Amino acid sequence: MDVVPFGGIQDQDGQIAWPPDQAFVMSVVGFDEASKSTLRFVLPDGTQFDVVSLEGLGMLKLIAWNERPHARARDAVDLCIILVNYHTVAGETLYTEHDDLLDDDFDYQIAGARIYGRMIAPLLAPNDQLRGALVSVLQEQTGDAGHSPLALAMGSECCGEYERRFQLLCALLRGIEDRL
């Protein structure tokens, strides 16, 4: 479990330095936006805690990977796992809210990744800088089908074919653009 800091504790560059000596610096870009999409859980003993939504988690995974791609490969794999499986989370909303995705070339995973993008977009909408940065990262990673470091980092253990991972990223970007 990760404990995530947020709420006005970062500097102007979106970073925090951990006490006591401020030696460990961590980016918290997107944390405030992710905190607005948390889900509250209550344990039988009454203990309450908030968990970031899948939409907020994916946004944070993309930011973390982009900031340190060689050190954050696990974030790319985690994003891939979400993209591959989000159609199961979307469930019936595919037919009730996203039926425009049902075409002759229908593919559950691609539709799920696009729905995921549509669900991330409202988190990005209020923050021009964050929205621009995330869209820019995805545009860069989907600009050349033969060269996407993110699709490569997502790894074959998540989704075997590089081309498929690239398609999922394209669907994610398209979904975000659908709602911006």
Model-derived features: where do they sit?
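Compositionally biased terminal segments of proteins
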Residues: 1-180
